[in-house]
Amino acid sequence: LRIHNYEDVLHMIDLLSVLSYLEVLNGQYTILSHRIDHYHAYDGTEGEEWIITMQNDYPVPRQLSCKQDCFYLMIGKNRTSLRIPVYEGELHYFYSNYRDYYYLKKEDMAIHKSVASFVDKEYRENAKASNCYTRKSGKFLPQYNSVMQPEFRKEYKDKISYFEMTDDFCTS
C-alpha cells in the first residue's frame, strides 16, 4: 500500500503543470499587442475581429483552443491569443427605469416624460422595458458580464451585451 501511495504522489507532480491553464484563465499574463483584423467569412461577408496577444506568466504543457459563442481562445505554450468579433451596426441602450419614459413609435425611441410632455399624445405611449431605448450606431465588442458601461443590446432579453469600441478604448 505504501508503494502504491508513493507512486500516486510521485506521478501527481506531473499533473501540476495542468494548473497553468487556470493561471492563464485567471489573468496571469501580459498583453503584448492588440489589433483589428479584417476577414472574409465562408459566406462571402466581410467582418472585423479584435485580436489580443498575451504572454503567459506560466508555460502550459500543450496547446489548447476553444470557441465559446463568438469568442475564440488559443492557449499556446508561452502565448495566448483571443479573437473577438467586432459588431458593426445599430444596437439599443435600454433604460432601466422605463416607467419614467414614453416610447415614440415614429422615431423608434424612448424619451423622458419631462421632455415627452411637449409631444402630442397620439404620437407617444407609455414605454415598456422592451421598447425603452435609444439607438446607437457604431462598432461594438461583445461581453457576457456588465463590465464595460454603457452596455448595448440587440434585443432587451439578449444574454450578450456589447460596449462601444471607442478610439480611447483601442489605444488604452
Task: Give the ranges of each region predicted by the language model.
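DEDD superfamily 3′-5′ metal-dependent exonuclease/proofreading module
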Residues: 1-172
